[in-house]
A protein has these predicted regions:
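Short hydrophobic beta-strand element within catalytic cores of glycosyltransferases
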Residues: 289-292
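Aromatic "clamp/platform" in nucleotide-sugar-dependent glycosyltransferases that forms part
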Residues: 272-275
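N-terminal strand-loop element at the rim of the active site
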Residues: 15-76, 150-153
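A short, active-site helix/loop in glycosyltransferases that binds the activated sugar's phosphate group
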Residues: 138-163
Length: 367
């Protein structure tokens, strides 16, 4: 199944009953693209959707235009929204905890998607994270995992009903001429271009990526690595890039990730953990060779259509990228395999239909 845009919202009264009322709860912007896609599809099927999220997420993703009522994520607003809902759907464990607290005293079913929540830290912080996961897993009527490892984790934490629910990414193809323009803008017309995309946080593995970049300095021509994303590690990464004269540019937050990936010779995903990596999906769809760490849900997602390396091994990462840069035929084979693999993923409509079937099932249980 290839990904396709969900249908635009149209008025409907499903099943001859009053419209189902849902609240989508976000704790940040990480799941916003998925929630906007889900909102569009649910609204098209006659579901009334309220999105409770940070104001900045509404400003960037415009849930209202997708057919939702937007409510800021203040505690009082969340409580009021949840009190009027038939189903509450939280995206992420922290959002799940906030939703569970807001629903205390109510019998409204809670659905929790765990996409984006990785392995817990060690020590006291890890114990606290484990406690949070157990509370949320037990509070949820259904837990949806974007990858099989997340489903397993939810079950270990006590989820009574945990299911695999892959998240489709909205297709955003870039025009061929845009790729050439992007290379020119980045200064990579006559040198290879490597692209990584994601927030500058520890689990993304960018320190390992910079270690690998030291080895690429000796290639002729030396590739340019660009990293699109923002986060707390920016200052430290910038200091390393300057001190070690690494062929790396930090681009900050970008809204044209698809355009950047279409321009790349190789996409790089060095993360410590990923459930259903957005970068991997966009790279394979765009027909760009991908080198990724063999972690989380990545192997399940990409199959044989990417080169996988161990996490935390800069030598293996550097060698894999160098080998692809030296072998255009192998890159072309991966590009073709990537498009074939991407065609097997659920579409946005498939994702909406699966989520709506869960909501309907919960409503039937309550009757």
């Amino acid at each position: 199944m290839s990904s396709s845009p969900v249908s635009p919202p149209v008025p409907a009264q499903p099943y001859g009953r009053p419209p189902l009322r849902t609240v989508q709860v976000l704790d940040g912007a990480g799941s916003s693209a998925h929630v906007r896609s889900l909102t569009t599809g649910l609204a098209a099927r006659g579901v009334r959707v309220t999105v409770c999220a940070p104001v900045r997420a509404e400003g960037e993703y415009d849930f209202t235009a997708a057919g939702a009522q937007f409510t800021p994520d203040a505690v009082s607003a969340l409580r009021a929204a949840c009190a009027a809902a038939d189903v509450v759907h939280a995206h992420g464990v922290r959002a799940g905890m906030r939703a569970a607290l807001a629903l205390r005293g109510h019998r409204t079913p809670l659905v929790v998607s765990w996409h984006g929540d990785g392995p817990a830290a060690r020590g006291a912080l890890g114990r606290l994270a484990g406690l949070l996961e157990r509370r949320v897993a037990k509070a949820a009527a259904v837990v949806l995992g974007a990858s099989s490892d997340q489903v397993d984790q939810a079950r270990l934490r006590g989820a009574r009903d945990a299911r695999l629910a892959p998240v489709a990414v909205p297709a955003a193809p870039a025009a061929p001429d845009e790729a050439a323009k992007a290379r020119a803008e980045l200064g990579a017309v006559e040198r290879p271009l490597l692209v990584a995309v994601g927030s500058l946080v520890p689990h993304r593995g960018y320190s390992v990526l910079l270690d690998a970049a030291r080895e690429w300095r000796d290639l002729d021509p030396s590739p340019l690595l660009v990293i699109a994303g923002e986060g707390p590690l920016r200052a430290g990464l910038s200091r390393r890039i300057e001190a070690e004269a690494l062929p790396v540019r930090l681009l900050g937050r970008r809204r044209d990730a698809a355009r950047l990936l279409a321009a790349a010779d190789v996409a790089v995903l060095p993360s410590r953990w990923e459930p259903r990596a957005l970068l991997a999906q966009e790279a394979l769809r765009a027909g760009v060779a991908l080198v990724a760490t063999e972690v989380g849900g990545v192997p399940e997602l990409v199959g044989d259509a990417a080169v996988l390396v161990p996490y935390g091994d800069p030598g293996a990462l550097a060698r894999a990228v160098s080998a692809l840069l030296a072998d255009p035929g192998r890159r072309a084979d991966l590009a073709a395999a990537g498009r074939i693999q991407a065609a097997t993923w659920p579409s946005e409509d498939d994702t909406v239909a699966q989520v709506l079937s869960v909501y309907d099932e919960l409503m039937e249980r309550a009757r």
